[in-house]
């Protein structure tokens, strides 16, 4: 709508030719993509190891007793990772199937999913890696690498991991 209303000025970055074609959203140079990343589930490796648990391999598992009260997600209305995860659940479960994304979210709610307004609060307050009580969090695929690179004390591997489930990882 904003493009149609003509509210943007044109600007062509000098290095636009280095941007992948999939991210060129406007060939009139009114809008330029500046950032992207994959959103998926992350897990606290130490917590799961101590509990003798393996990360879930399907979204359906998140509604089972093993994962009750163990997932924190971001609100889709206030957080882009939360919206990305919601969209991925629509892609995964569909909209009009016998069991669709609305059924999944109802089951997540019944399984004590915690919904926070933003990523920082979910990750740094409720994720077990930072003292919370939820070993699963919706985050970025780059979060484990960031945990490794920016660790206050040197580590030999990331303390968190990605849960890469087909159709449950979203490029934003």
Where do the language-model regions lie?
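Periplasmic solute-binding protein
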Residues: 1-8, 24-54, 82-92, 170-172
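Extracellular/periplasmic catalytic domains that process cell-envelope and extracellular macromolecules
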Residues: 9, 24-26, 32-35, 64-66, ...
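Ligand-binding pocket segment of bilobal, Venus flytrap-like solute-binding proteins
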Residues: 81-165
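Short, charged, surface-exposed loops that flank catalytic or proteolytic processing sites
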Residues: 53-58, 101
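Phosphate-coordinating loops and pocket residues in cytosolic domains that bind phosphorylated ligands
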Residues: 4, 64, 110
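Short loop->beta-strand "edge-of-pocket" segments that line small-molecule binding or catalytic clefts
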Residues: 60-80, 88-93
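Pocket-flanking alpha-helical
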Residues: 1-7, 16-26, 125-126, 144-152
